Amino acid sequence: MAKVAGFRFELKQLFHLMWPILITQFAQAGLGLIDTIMAGHLSANDLAAIAVGVGLWMPVMLLFSAIMIATTPLVAEAKGARTPEHIPVIVRQSLWVAVSLGVIAMLILQLMPFLLPILGVPESLQPKAGLFLHAIGFGMPAVTMYAALRGYSEALGYPRPVTVISLLALVVLVPLNYIFMYGIGPVPHLGSAGCGFATAILQWLMLITLASYIYRAKAYQSTQVFSHWERINLTLVKRILKLGLPIGLAVFFEVSIFSTGAIVLSPLGDTLVAAHQIAMSVTSQLFMIPMSLAIALTIRVGMYYGEKNWVSMRLVQKLGLATATFFAMCTMSLIWFARPQIVAIYTQDPAVFDIALYLLLFAMAYQLMDAWQVGAAGCLRGMQDTKGPMWITLIAYWVVAFPVGTYLARVAKMGPAGVWLGLITGLSIACVLLLMRLYRNNHKLAQQS
């Protein structure tokens, strides 16, 4: 009979996993900030070209790297089932999938410059944005393989190596950007393309560093991934893709809906778009907290799922959602009491300032729903239920949130408030449906036992 986990023990385990993951998320966001700051010192044209390139690269990168999240619940399940011999096989096959997906993503990014005229990107930006996409695309195989190894390390309960590498990447990116963007010695001035090359090189360096650490560190020796290689196992590859593709699409649906607000509002003027982007930037930073908790929940739930310890699994879920509630209340309080100070970091323009201040009230309103829905999604991934959540996110965000937000913003003349009401509606529906699905899955498992 499986031993039931204690409340304090499980809370400690969640925080042990969550905090390094949270630091990793902030460090990765810092990489984008460094690119923006250094590109801004080149020229406004270079900065705009990189912004366009990142806008196209980011969805592709998130889609393909999110597919590799499947490694996490599979490794956690094998750990919980006490079958460590299965773990290296899972990771090796995940790396085969990662290489294949990385090459596909790289080819997509090489072709993307041809879409720039179709997307209405100004001719003045097309050459530099195209070169940026060509350059950064070479890093995609490293991105997907790194995601697979990261999932393996975190699922074993070792998130700190990834955190340290992410923090080191912040330090390394500055000189890399300087060398390739501004030129030094034999390296010519490459401008925005140099930013893409620097990021791609950094991604390969991060992969090599993590792989080297996993190869050498004692903690991984019992499940040594690199002891030998093996051929592609189509059965396991299909299982990885069956689990991972819905995760990737769900992440894509969620991320893309939040990036459409600026497009919907663009005909209504720069001031509204700027205010909307400020509010969106604030919520994106705050979202890293429940997202990091959700990754920790996937690991702990996945372990108990493999162990078939349903009582402890439900305890983790309840504890995770309670923790998500606590953090949501904290972020709501932060927004309520510090709105003026937060907006002042972004702008001093009076018109933009007032609208952003108003929009942060909508951001505050959905913190709880957002925390619950991402927490429930993390639990479901741990239970290897990914197809249902994919359809839920598609319906909630693109069948409901997008049309409702567009109608309220443009037809009902509500402007950015309409977009945010649409997002709140979609998030609320996703939250309710994901929690219902989690309850249903738990009820089924309870009946089976």
Curated annotation (Swiss-Prot):
It is found in: Cell inner membrane. Keywords: Antiport, Cell inner membrane, Cell membrane, Ion transport, Membrane, Transmembrane, Transmembrane helix, Transport. Coiled coil: none annotated. GO terms for biological process: monoatomic ion transport. The keyword Hydrolase does not apply. It holds the Pfam family MatE. InterPro entries: MATE_fam, MATE_MdtK, MdtK-like. Its main location: membrane. One of its GO terms (cellular component) is plasma membrane. The chain crosses the membrane at residues 17-39, 54-76, 97-119, 129-151, 164-186, 196-215, 243-265, 280-302, 315-337, 352-369, 390-412, 417-439. It is a multi-pass membrane protein. Belongs to the multi antimicrobial extrusion (MATE) (TC 2.A.66.1) family. Multidrug efflux pump. This is Probable multidrug resistance protein NorM.
